[in-house]
Amino acid sequence: MESVVLLLAFISLVCGYVIDPCTPQERSTWHVSIKLCIRVQEYKISSRGCRLTQGPGGLIATGNGFKIFAYDECGHDEHSFLLTNIRESVYASGHGMYAEISNNVTYLDLVSPCARNITIIVSCDDITINAYGKNIDELHPDVTITTLIDTSCVRGHSFAYSINTLCTERLSGESCEQLACQAIKGSQHENYLKACELNAPEQYMFKEYKPHQRPHVAKVLRDEL
């Protein structure tokens, strides 16, 4: 995709003048997007909507049959979590759930390495067995995304990542790698996705989670409660 930018710059130099196709802000701002498709068989997901709890170290999305934990590897007050937005939708009469976690991050290539080391965990609401399938991806610029999927109830999953500058996305005409989920493809997801309702962290919230989930809550909140 960056080759498009280089080609335009080369053509402009040959013609005797320089045209910068992007603004400085577009060059320095990165759009980070993580897309997940989760499929179940034994039970149906109730489309109750989702709730979002944000902490300094990450975020928690609850509802729609799953808990999603996302956090980095930074310590107390070291760096705020980079991703702030999550939207979800339920498909296939309750047998599938689609989620997008994203944000625009300025100077992503310069932030602390700990903030670029991100873990995404999908944990089922009604199952207490701690059994996760693990996947690790190394992405540019030095971003590591680890996904842990609760295999005790999830029967299939797929995911896609996109980390590009706004300049690259505008010139290429692509905002993110597309991910089909339960026969819904590409931009069609926009017709169904709903943003999670924001909740403030509370002292009692640890009691809402299973014992094996509480370490993830602590990583999100960085033990502030």
UniProtKB/Swiss-Prot annotation:
This is T4 protein. Disulfide bonds: none annotated. It comes from Rabbit fibroma virus (strain Kasza) (RFV). Pfam families: Pox_T4_C (PF04490), Pox_T4_N (PF04491). Belongs to the poxviruses B9 family.
